[in-house]
Each structure stands twice: as structure tokens, then as C-alpha cells.
Amino acid sequence: MQYKDLRDFISQLEQLGELRRVSTPVSPNLEMTEICDRLLRAGGPAVLFERPAGFRSPEGTYSVPVLANLFGTTHRVALGMGAQSLEDLRDIGRVLSALKEPEPPRGLREAGKLFTLAKSVWDMAPKRVSSPACQEIVWEGNDVDLARLPIQTCWPGDAAPLITWGLVVTKGPHKKRQNLGIYRQQVISRNQVIMRWLAHRGGALDFREHALANPGKPFPIAVALGADPATILGAVTPVPDTLSEYQFAGLLRGSRTALAGCLTPTLSELSVPASAEIVLEGHIQPDPDHPSGYQHALEGPYGDHTGYYNEQDWFPVFTIDRITMRRDPIYHSTYTGKPPDEPAVLGVALNEVFVPLLQKQFPEITDFYLPPEGCSYRMALVRMKKQYAGHAKRVMFGVWSFLRQFMYTKFIVVVDDDVDVRDWKEVIWAITTRVDPARDTVLVENTPIDYLDFASPVSGLGSKMGIDATDKWPGETTREWGRTISMDPAVKAKVDGMMATLFDRPAGT
């Protein structure tokens, strides 16, 4: 699907019956979560809540509608990435693999393809525009008040309203390009949020470099809310370091990404999507009393994609100096909870992008699956064509180290090519018949683990397990290995022809 911005995407979804409007007042405090959870589990449409309830106005409703469940099905994720189906996402993975590690052409034809790909990337370089739509309205001074936006409180035990789909734009002092990341943000005052980014994420790395290079100076940040789907999805896709997320978004969308410079002078190096619905401009301010030298606050607890409330922790405070927006802006939001939720659906879709990337590095991999029940990234199932003893273990460690997205994968199960990794029954059969626990499990201690994983003994540091559920080769066992049972193909073909009439004859005749 080709589209210009979020509004165009919404319009096309509505024409396809993939989006419904709700005019009845619905509260962003818990009610939207429950409605969207039911819609997502039923494979239902995206929803535009036109009159969010609860604002301190005579009507008791916000003037800003809420867009939710936008990526509630893999089909809509595919449409957002410029594809028509989930299967088409493999092609996007192939493009990324070619950009990540291009191979020398073996002839003029391949050279032509490589040139065409390079030209298409070059042609999608983002462009700066003047008078962007995202700056049609500007809030400054006391007008900057997050309470004027219908920010969701998703679960009963949540600490405060939470910004969920904010596209955070940062730039390190030594970086050539900006980083785009999606980090949740707890509202703590009219113009302050807690920026919850994990230590290895791009935004946190940019902030750390800034603090070292410019101690005591505010760190500039812009947050785009309601960016177009390609830009949002580009921020969570394993884009090569040599390619900007904005450029990749242009490839997905089929048109160059229009960017706007921020109005705050100290944010001059940051660019935001010109079509974004709402933009927050501000800084992480210095605090000489904090060990880091910058303002921090205690974040959480919040219900998360694990299905649990996470523990509290300290993160930087983002102070908002200015809010810009389009006329009649739309607030894009989501919730996270026990799978399935939108991150789980995104995980299933992005899984198809990962497969060609992995196969480029490890041609022996024939399929790869991140089951959504495993919180989309904590368990990986790998199907491969095994070629030698120890091969499965090599692949395990390769997957853990190849992409940053698999840094937090706790469990990897490797099976042979005769096992469907997308069928739990087959995976369990392989584990229970081909695994000796002492020989075929690998435990790795003191590895990076998701901070939200309370099962790890130390926050952010824990162990990983690999399970080799492949047939064992000489050197891996001294016993005769079992042969799988299968019917004679000729008999199967004969019975296929018999089944249609075999049970038509009445009993006893």
C-alpha cells in the first residue's frame, strides 16, 4: 500500500474496512485498553476514538481523538510497511540483507541489480521542508500541558498515564546521523516525562556520549507522536547502520520522507517527520545532585508485554519546552500486556523480515520463528539443515550475536529440517525424542537480559539456554540413532483414492 502520511493511511484502512470510528465517549483510563484488547484478540479493526472521555471541559471530552490498535493484525503491519501480505515482508528482509552485506556482482546482470538497489536507496534520501504540517499549532510556556492530550492509563496498577508510540529522536555528539527509537514515557507533570530507555538502546547511548562530551549541558530530544507507519516501523526494524531509518521509511512508503527542523534553537541538529501529528521538543536537564549529573526520577510500575507489572527503576527526566502539532491532531496510542498485544503482532510480522537476514549469514537455516507466546523475542525456534557434529550449537551462538534484536533471547531451540518450527506439537516432539538434557542443553551465564525480566537474578544480567533438538551425528552419540517412521508413498497414494468411497457402503453389506 502506498500512502503519504498517517492520515492517508487511516483513510485507506477505513475504505478497506480495517478501521472503525467510535463516537461514543470512551475513557483513555483503562477503558480503551479493554476495548482494544478484545479487538486485537478477535483480529478486529483499528479504531479511532473520536471523543475520548475525561477531559476538564464543559463537554467532558478531549478535542484530540485517539488512534489505537493500528498494528493489531499482521496484515495491517504489512500494509504499513508498503506490502500487501505477510509473505511480502520476506522481500523487505532480502533488501535489508543485500544492504547490510552486499556481495560482489558475478556478472553484468547482478551488477545492474545492485546499481538499481543502490540508486533506489539514494533516491529515498529524506528532504527538509519549510512550513511543515506538524508545526501548524504551537504550544509554549504555560500552554505546554500534557493533560490536554488523551494519554492512556492502560492497567489498574500503572503509576501514571503513559506515552507509548512516541518516536524519540536523538543524536550523539560524534554521530553522523540521528537515532530513532520508541521508548515509553511516564507523565510526571504538565511538561515532564520519564524517558525509559535501556542502556544498549540508541537513545541511551547518544545520551551517555553527550554526558561525557558535554557534561552539565542539556541533552536535546524531540518526540514525534503520530508519525506515518513506515517511519514508526522503520524504527523497530534491523536497519543497517549505514542506512537512516528515515531513508528506509522512504523505501517502504515509496516516497522520500519529508522532515522538519525543530523550532527550539538548541534542537537544530534534530529533524522530525514533517507530517507527524504532535511533536514534543525539549531536553534532559542537568542535575548536579544526581550521580549522573542529570535529572532522573523513579519510573513505574507498569503493566508490560510480559504480562506482569515491572519493578521500578530510575531513568532520565525529559522536560518539554514546546509542543507543536497539526490542526486537529490525532493521538496515536497502544497498550502492552500478556501476549497477544501489538508488540506481539509486530514480532510475528517482523519475524518474516528476520528470516532472509539470518539466511544470508547462515544459509543452513531454513526457517526461523519467534513465537508470540514467548513475548516475541525471549524464545527463538530455528530449523536448519545440519551438516556436521556441533553444527546446531554454532547456529545458536550465531543467532544470539548476529542482530541486536536477539540480545535478549533467553531460549533458542534448534531442530532439523523435517520439523515445522511454527507447529508447537512438532517442536515438543523433537525436544522429547532428540534431546538428552545433559548433552544437548547449553547454559550461558552473565549475559545481557531484558531489564523487565524479573526472573533473572540481577537486573539486566542473566543466563541463556540453547537446546539442540536435532538428530545426533557420530561424535555426538555412540548409539544407533532412531529412524523416523513414514508410510510407503505408493500406499499413501492408493489410500488417497480409496478414502472417498471406502466408508460409503452400509455396514454388513
Curated annotation (Swiss-Prot):
Keywords: Cell membrane, Decarboxylase, Flavoprotein, FMN, Lyase, Manganese, Membrane, Metal-binding, Ubiquinone biosynthesis. The active site is at D304 (proton donor). The keyword DNA-binding does not apply. SUPFAM superfamilies: FMN-binding split barrel, UbiD C-terminal domain-like. Its EC number is 4.1.1.98. InterPro entries: UbiD, UbiD-like_C, UbiD-like_N, UbiD_bacteria, UbiD_Rift_dom. Homohexamer. This is 3-octaprenyl-4-hydroxybenzoate carboxy-lyase. It comes from Cupriavidus pinatubonensis (strain JMP 134 / LMG 1197) (Cupriavidus necator (strain JMP 134)). The gene is ubiD.
